[in-house]
Design a protein with these regions (language model features):
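Short strand-loop junctions, especially beta-strand C-caps/beta-turns
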Residues: 156, 212, 236-238, 409-413, ...
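Glycine- and other small-residue-rich loops at beta-strand/loop junctions that grip anionic moieties
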Residues: 96, 154, 188, 236-244, ...
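General small-molecule cofactor/ligand-binding pocket signal
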Residues: 152, 207-209, 436
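A short, small-residue-rich loop immediately preceding and capping a beta-strand
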Residues: 149-155, 184-187
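FAD-binding core of FAD-dependent oxidoreductases
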Residues: 91-100, 159-162, 193, 299-304, ...
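Conserved PLP-enzyme active-site core in the AAT-like
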Residues: 130-133, 160-331, 338, 418-419, ...
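Non-catalytic terminal extensions of PLP-dependent enzymes
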Residues: 1-149, 167, 174-177, 276, ...
Length: 525
């Protein structure tokens, strides 16, 4: 169907390059950089760099690195970038639950500075006072934002922060001699799936609460679930459907009365910054995704940071080291009585920490609150407009307003036309909108999750809405066009079955060759 006059939709087609993997571009003898020999005064001082390495650990053959000239490397990655979509290219609001906001480029420049890039975690503390100050002051900022008493910046993702919460919870009960009997973790179906998954990795039996007719976690079900076996509660609020539970303090009270610990998954905190805090809801632990909420980029599996906060009582269990300040200098503090130890090497993903620190400083307290308000405003504007599109609904209509996102349903459209949510999102890719299907678990039928954040203008939201309207009209008039989409992307369809088959996984070049041989490596998209 042609784009209608007056529509904000753009004619879009991705570039397609029959581009090899970088290893396939290798030509013996080519080089991108000539590494000079170390000067004599340096080699005399530090040696040859190899003699201290045990012979059993030394290579017997040269590493199989690609030999490619600089110009060809530049072309390679520019071509790949043209085959991609990202937050700097499109209205990236369809990636619900992921808070794809604008990442200020000045913060990228700060993090790329040699002052940040050239320091090493093994340096003496006296030589990295600036970095330690950034980490210490970010801890202070997050204390104010959450109301909790101390933060560890060590976890390197939201899921790792949840696993760290589970480890702290286990150690807390271990100290009290109850770890063996308190083996149940309560969560909700619309909390982030990692809340259940990470706790299960730690060995907990998971009890999942379902919502009532208003979309709220059922408080009566919680009362029935708690027992002497309750280790704790991990819950996201607002949940992944965008509904804020106003009875959250009642939930924590019920779990505390049963002897459990309450952990707050604040992956969806973008709509409540400066408005409500973990402290007032009486949580013991919480974490923020710095790579989402606080302006550092989110995507491609990292880098990330799940800053983990604790009350004064549970701060005794945080990973070591935390950063301290004695009035004259910053230092790495290992004096944490019941620490669970380390959850990663060194002290955290420092570039992410630095970007988040700069983002908070640039906005200030009122700016954080304004960002949250605009995110909520954008979301509720979309809520009204999307639900006016025939075939789109918003489940749990008892909650008239949502916070930072909404999980919509295309069930009515599917029943009428046979076009499902995957078809809609694939067709949206033909107009330059990032395809994403993060709507798990599929409790809402034909789910579709949108999170606009504070970054997008009304005009950009209207452009996205025009895309949805166009695709829905096509679903009724040209369903095969939608079914066969995308038409303008680099890859038409990806066989997603391999994602669930470990035998097919090959996340490195070496693994690809080992599993499938060079014939498979030559296959082009």
């Amino acid at each position: 169907m042609e784009i209608q006059p007056g529509s904000r939709l753009r004619n879009f087609h991705q570039a397609k390059w029959d581009e090899e993997v970088i290893f396939e571009l290798s030509t013996p003898g080519q080089r991108g950089l000539h590494v000079p020999e170390a000067e004599t005064e340096i080699s005399d001082l530090v040696g040859d760099g190899l003699s201290r390495i045990p012979a059993s650990m030394r290579r017997t053959t040269a590493p199989a690195l690609p030999e490619v000239g600089q110009m060809r490397v530049l072309k390679h990655y520019l071509r790949l970038s043209q085959q991609n979509l990202g937050g700097d290219l499109n209205v990236d609001i369809g990636q619900g639950t992921c808070t794809m906001k604008y990442n200020p480029k000045i913060n990228e420049k700060i993090a790329a500075s040699s002052k940040a890039q050239d320091i090493h975690p093994h340096q003496d503390e006296s030589t990295v006072q600036g970095a330690l100050r950034v980490m210490y002051e970010l801890d202070l900022f997050l204390r104010e934002i959450s109301g909790l008493d101390r933060f560890s910046l060590q976890p390197s993702s939201g899921s790792q922060a949840i696993l760290t919460m589970a480890a702290i919870m286990h150690e807390y009960h271990e100290v009290r001699g109850q770890a063996d009997t308190r083996d149940e973790l309560i969560t909700t179906i619309f909390s982030h799936p990692s809340d259940a998954a990470a706790a299960a990795v730690k060995g907990y039996r998971i009890i999942t609460l379902y919502p009532d007719e208003q979309g709220m976690p059922d408080v009566e079900a919680l009362k029935a679930a708690v027992s002497e076996r309750t280790a704790g509660l991990f819950i996201t609020n607002p949940e992944d459907i965008g509904i804020f539970n106003p009875r959250i303090a009642e939930f924590t009270r019920i779990v505390h009365e049963a002897g459990g610990i309450c952990g707050y998954d604040q992956a969806n905190a973008n709509g409540i910054l400066g408005i409500t805090r973990a402290r007032e809801a009486d949580f013991d632990l919480c974490f923020f995704n710095l790579h989402k909420t606080f302006g550092a980029p989110h995507g491609c599996g990292g880098p990330a940071a799940g800053a983990l906060g604790a009350t004064r009582e549970l701060a005794e269990y945080l990973p070591v080291p935390v950063v301290g300040y004695d009035g004259s200098k910053y230092f790495l503090d290992y004096d944490v009585p019941h620490t669970i130890g380390k959850v990663r090497g060194f002290y955290g993903a420092f570039p992410v920490i630095l970007k988040s620190y700069a983002w908070i400083l640039s906005l200030g307290a009122e700016g954080l609150k304004e960002a949250a308000r605009v995110a909520v405003l954008n979301n509720n504007y979309l809520l009204k407009k999307v639900t006016e599109i025939p075939g789109a609904t918003s489940p749990y209509t008892g909650s008239k307003r949502r916070i930072e996102q909404v999980r919509y349903s295309w069930e009515e459209l599917y029943n009428e036309t046979g076009i499902d949510t995957h078809d809609v999102t694939r067709r949206m890719a033909d107009f330059g909108f990032h395809l994403w299907q993060s709507h798990h678990p599929f409790v809402v039928p034909q789910p579709f999750t949108i999170e606009p954040t504070e970054s997008y203008s009304k005009e950009e939201l209207d452009e996205y809405l025009d895309g949805l309207r166009h695709v829905v009209e096509e679903a009724r008039t040209e369903p095969e066009t939608v079914k066969r989409a995308p038409h303008n992307s680099v890859v038409h369809r990806i066989d997603e079955s391999s994602l669930d088959d470990p035998e097919k996984w090959a996340v490195t070049w070496r693994a690809l060759l080992k599993k499938h041989g060079r014939t498979a490596a030559k296959i082009r998209s």
